[in-house]
Regions:
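Enriched for short, Lys/Arg-rich terminal
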Residues: 217, 222-235
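Short coil-to-beta-strand transition motifs
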Residues: 2-8, 95-105, 214
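Short, conserved beta-turn/loop elements at beta-strand boundaries and strand-helix junctions
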Residues: 17, 110-116, 225
Length: 235
């Protein structure tokens, strides 16, 4: 059996500082923009010449936060309620023999300055610090297949949770929006996806959660109406 070694070509900069609450696919949280910073020796303007003519990219990356857990032959996809097992190769699970992921993202801008090459990205589903091993332009004529079937994931999951904020948090957000544009919308879109583990859904009201987004620990509670954000703590 052959083995291969790959070099990291870049790193992701993202508002998601931990894997909890990262959307399961790009495009679900529209306000979650990020960047891909190429690293030496790949941070050359020549390496991205012509890339600006493409609207979207495939990013191939490493599941660096789960790779120590090894691979599993079967997993439980969240879209199936977290109870039904499927073969790992029939899912997008992180627990793969080779911890490689792929993400289709919008390319907003290519910025080259001296030894810096930065790709400005649209809505993404990657944790801050994610290692990138390759990028490829998206080719609509070959890769857009409207008639394809996709089993349990034929359509995007609905944003099912109503998200509200306490008066104190709303006051904080008004001030923070100057430095973090669309912060309120970002938090709302992330939590509306209901990032809780599938087995936690349907639990009693009052349960609290926290997630690290941007530079803040966002704390929220389960209510009869959905989720209520009650604290925004700088980190």
């Amino acid at each position: 059996m052959s083995s291969f070694q790959f070099e990291q070509i870049g790193v992701i900069r993202s508002p998601y500082k931990e894997k909890f609450a990262v959307p399961r696919q790009p495009g679900l949280v529209k306000s979650a923009n990020g960047e891909l910073h190429l690293i030496a020796p790949y941070n050359q303007a020549d390496a991205v010449r012509g890339l600006e003519a493409f609207s979207h990219l495939w990013i191939l990356f490493v599941f660096h936060q789960t790779m120590e857990g090894g691979w599993r032959p079967t997993v439980r996809p969240p879209r199936l309620g977290g109870n039904t097992r499927m073969g790992v190769f029939a899912t997008r699970s992180t627990f793969r023999p080779n911890p490689i992921g792929m993400s289709l993202v919008e390319l907003k801008e290519v910025v080259c300055h001296k030894d810096s090459v930065i790709l400005k990205l649209g809505s993404l589903d990657l944790v801050d610090g994610t290692p990138v091993v390759d990028i490829k332009p998206y080719l609509p004529f070959a890769e857009s297949l409207p008639d394809a079937s996709a089993s349990y994931a034929q359509s995007a999951p609905a944003a099912e949770m109503t998200v509200s904020f306490t008066a104190e948090v709303e006051k904080q957000l008004l001030t923070l929006e100057k430095r973090y544009p669309q912060l309120t919308l970002f938090i709302r879109e992330v939590l509306a996806q209901d990032p809780r583990p599938a087995y936690r859904k349907g639990e009693e009201t009052g349960k609290t959660y926290a997630v690290w987004l941007h530079d803040f620990n966002v704390r929220w509670r389960v209510t009869d109406a959905g989720f209520e954000v009650f604290a925004l703590e700088p980190r």
